[in-house]
């Protein structure tokens, strides 16, 4: 079983990102990214996933936020992969439905070792403030690829873009919290008949 913590630093010609993650945390979150709305969403993951998360990022925001958002997803995915270790004894699967007023989203995930993102979200507008909502999919794709998880994100209802985004990130945090729980009945076994994830 892993100690559920990881610190990952990633630097490219476009961005510098550092993520500090504790999956056995209390929901604490700090960030310096230059992207306040993304920070607001990541705070939801930390609070509802009961994980402690620090994200520091700088990037070519003078061009746009794409590289920075994607690389935060990549680095968080790498941190998740490290923190989970060999996944012995973990529940492996998690899901959550989260409402916020008129919005309702469902997130289902599998810490399978098989990166796959299924993202079905239609926002009623292209931006929330100055944040391009297309970048949420880029964030999750980067995360999925490097955490090696299967992730299904479905927005079932919603008219308000902020509400839609918030239900997605809250549901992701809650689903992750379930999947990373240690099950003592497994007695050190993986939740797989293959013997590996």
Swiss-Prot record:
Q: Which UniProt keywords apply?
A: Amino-acid biosynthesis, Cytoplasm, Histidine biosynthesis, Lyase
Write down the top EC class of this protein.
Answer: lyase
Q: Is Cytoplasm given among the entry's keywords?
A: yes
Which InterPro entries does the protein's record reference? IGPD_sf (IPR038494), ImidazoleglycerolP_deHydtase (IPR000807), ImidazoleglycerP_deHydtase_CS (IPR020565), Ribosomal_Su5_D2-typ_SF (IPR020568)
- What does the record give as EC number? 4.2.1.19
**CDD domains to which the protein is assigned, alphabetical:** IGPD
Q: What is its main location?
A: cytoplasm
What are its GO biological-process terms?
L-histidine biosynthetic process
Q: Which residues cross the membrane?
A: none
What protein family is recorded? Answer: Belongs to the imidazoleglycerol-phosphate dehydratase family.
The name under which this protein is listed is Imidazoleglycerol-phosphate dehydratase
- The protein's gene is named hisB
